[in-house]
């Protein structure tokens, strides 16, 4: 099987889907080639709700699922944070809810999309990433700082920008 991954905001209504995904992963990806990534974006529940206005699993629910999903020697589940100015990033909250044995943390800059501009969101990767990463590693977490190809920003091909432009032109 080829390496595969799934990125999700962990919709609460999709718990059955997650169970099916776990079965598929265990049956078809026995070579540790599957990773799941949960979009977290903030450690403050109200801010998280604002960023992702859907019913979603709590940190504890994500943690319980991740512990079942990741077996010894497999890729850790990733907790993804898009670094946005003004949001809370508290390593102690992550450490209270998640195990560094089963989870790693990935931080990405907010891409300068039309949607981000309309919402007044600004990236603060430089201000947030290093201090947050330092505190997380102090709690035993592996941390990934992930900066995409900046050419994607220039040509507008990240985060669904191309689809949005196409939709507006139709």
Q: Which residues make up each language-model segment?
A:
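Core AdoMet radical
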Residues: 1-72, 76-85, 104-108
């Amino acid at each position: 099987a080829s390496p595969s991954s799934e990125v999700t905001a962990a919709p609460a209504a999709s718990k059955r889907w997650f169970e099916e995904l776990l079965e598929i992963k265990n049956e078809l990806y026995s070579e540790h080639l599957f990773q799941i990534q949960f979009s977290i974006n903030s450690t403050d529940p109200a801010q998280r709700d604002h960023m992702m206005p859907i019913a979603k699993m709590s940190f504890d629910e994500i943690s319980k699922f991740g512990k079942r999903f990741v077996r010894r020697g497999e890729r850790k589940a990733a907790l993804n944070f898009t670094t946005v100015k003004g949001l809370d990033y508290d390593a102690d909250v992550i450490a209270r809810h998640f195990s560094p044995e089963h989870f790693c943390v990935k931080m990405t800059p907010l891409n300068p999309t039309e949607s981000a501009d309309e919402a007044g969101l600004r990236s603060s990767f430089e201000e947030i990433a290093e201090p947050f990463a330092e505190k997380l590693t102090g709690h035993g977490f592996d941390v990934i700082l992930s900066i995409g190809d900046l050419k994607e920003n220039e040509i507008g091909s990240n985060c669904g920008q191309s689809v949005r432009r196409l939709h507006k032109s139709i």
